[in-house]
Amino acid sequence: MRERLAALCPFLTGGQLSQFETYYAMLVEWNTRMNLTALTEPAEVAEKHFADSLLPMALVPEGARCIDVGTGAGFPGVPILIARPDIRCVLLDSLNKRLTFLEAVLAELGL
C-alpha cells in the first residue's frame, strides 16, 4: 500500500505515509466488525480512497477550512488531515459507529 500511495502522491512525506499505513491497518481491522468499505485491497485503497481524496488539494489555499459531510470511513476528510496539516477539516456522519471508528483513527494518528 505504501509503495502504491508514494507513487501516486510523491509529495507525501515518510511520516505521512506511515500515518496512511496506520489508517489502512485500522480500516481493515475495524471493517471486519462493521461495514466501513467494500474496498480493502492495499492498492485499491491507496488509489481509490487515499489518492483520490487528495486530488483537489493543490487547489485548496493554505489554512482553509472544510467539512466532510457524510464522511463514512473518513474519505476524503482523514486523508486531507494527514496530507495537509494546515487545513482544519470537520468530519460529519449520521452513524455513531463510524464516528467511533474515526475518533479512534484520529487519536491514533495524533490528528
Kindly label every feature range from the protein language model.
Residues 1-63, 97-100, 104-109:
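Class I SAM-dependent transferase core
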Residues 48, 66, 83-87:
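Alpha-helix termini
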Residues 63-72:
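Conserved class I S-adenosyl-L-methionine
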Residues 73-86:
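Conserved SAM-binding loop of SAM-dependent methyltransferases across substrates and taxa
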Residues 87, 110-111:
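A short helix-to-beta-strand connector/capping loop
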Residues 88-93:
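Conserved SAM-binding motif I beta-strand of class I
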